[in-house]
């Protein structure tokens, strides 16, 4: 079993159910909190848009993209207020400037990707995109492809590792999570055999390096600590609705002690509070 980072885990974590939003989305996937914490942006796949939720009530208060997106799967937002959206069924990533709840389309990327379902704006300036239909990850620099990793199977999420350089990739069709270098070299593998993944999708990272992954077809959220152990699993492996129950969950976003999850099969977002055990 592989170590996730060199940062020690200080304490185990528990998660307490807080609130479930209304079922007003359609197969929500990954989500992202705005840099100022005021808005929760959700990839609303079935509605071909990015839905904007109040982070507390989890009600939809706005949206953008429904007039030109198709099958929206992922969103990332950089510190400058630009949003990068996996416009999956159009086989492109759309780029926007964001001002509160207003989005302006300013560009797109589509070279050598089909059906993108994951996007990451890296601190190194590159934009990394996972092509779920083309089974690859490409790195764009100044709008041009500079690197490519082939031989994947329906790759999904891309998340920045805690060291600020590495990239975690959900290689969904192979039921594994990979740690990549910025040059797309595979450094580590979290395998199906070790973690019983079945369609691992979107992820986020705690400050200590703990990886939180939505294991879609197991209807679970798995916490994998830096020492490779799995101290917490939310969900009993069966589809459901209610505290600690999910149906094909996809999206994960964490900020401080708050954890938001896309309970995709139930068409809603749920919120949990993270607690550390002494």
Region annotations inferred by a language model:
Residues 248-278:
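Blade-level signature of beta-propeller repeat domains, shared across WD40, Kelch, NHL, RCC1
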Residues 7-33, 38-42, 272:
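An edge-strand/N-cap motif at the start of beta-rich repeat modules
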Residues 42-46, 85-91, 129-133, 167-175, ...:
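Conserved beta-strand positions in repeat-built beta-propeller and related beta-rich domains
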Residues 54-58, 97-101, 140-144, 181-185, ...:
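Short loop/turn segments that connect beta-strands within beta-propeller blades
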Residues 22-35, 67-79, 111-123, 151-165, ...:
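Beta-rich, blade/repeat-based domains predominating
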């Amino acid at each position: 079993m592989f170590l996730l980072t060199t940062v020690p885990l200080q304490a185990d974590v528990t998660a307490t159910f807080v609130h479930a939003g209304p079922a007003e989305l359609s197969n929500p996937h990954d989500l992202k909190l705005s840099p100022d914490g005021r808005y929760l942006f959700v990839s609303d796949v079935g509605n071909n848009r990015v839905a904007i939720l109040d982070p507390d009530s989890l009600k939809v208060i706005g949206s953008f993209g429904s007039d030109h997106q198709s099958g929206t799967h992922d969103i990332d937002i950089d510190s400058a207020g630009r949003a990068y959206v996996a416009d999956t069924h159009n086989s492109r990533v759309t780029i926007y400037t964001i001002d509160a709840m207003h989005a302006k389309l300013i560009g797109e990327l589509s070279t050598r990707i089909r059906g993108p379902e994951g996007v990451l704006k890296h601190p190194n300036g590159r934009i990394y995109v996972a092509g779920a239909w083309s089974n690859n990850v490409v790195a764009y620099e100044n709008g041009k492809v500079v690197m490519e990793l082939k031989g994947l199977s329906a790759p999904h999420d891309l998340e920045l590792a805690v060291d600020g350089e590495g990239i975690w990739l959900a290689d969904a069709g192979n039921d594994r999570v990979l740690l990549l270098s910025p040059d797309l070299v595979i450094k580590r593998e979290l395998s199906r055999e070790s973690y019983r993944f079945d369609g691992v999708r979107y992820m986020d990272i705690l400050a200590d390096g703990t990886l939180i992954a939505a294991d879609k077809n197991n209807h679970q959220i798995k916490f994998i600590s830096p020492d490779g152990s799995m101290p917490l699993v939310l969900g009993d492996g069966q589809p459901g609705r209610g505290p600690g129950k999910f149906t094909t969950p996809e999206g994960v976003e964490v900020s401080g002690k708050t954890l938001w999850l896309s309970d995709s099969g139930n068409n809603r977002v749920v919120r949990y509070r993270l607690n550390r055990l002494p």
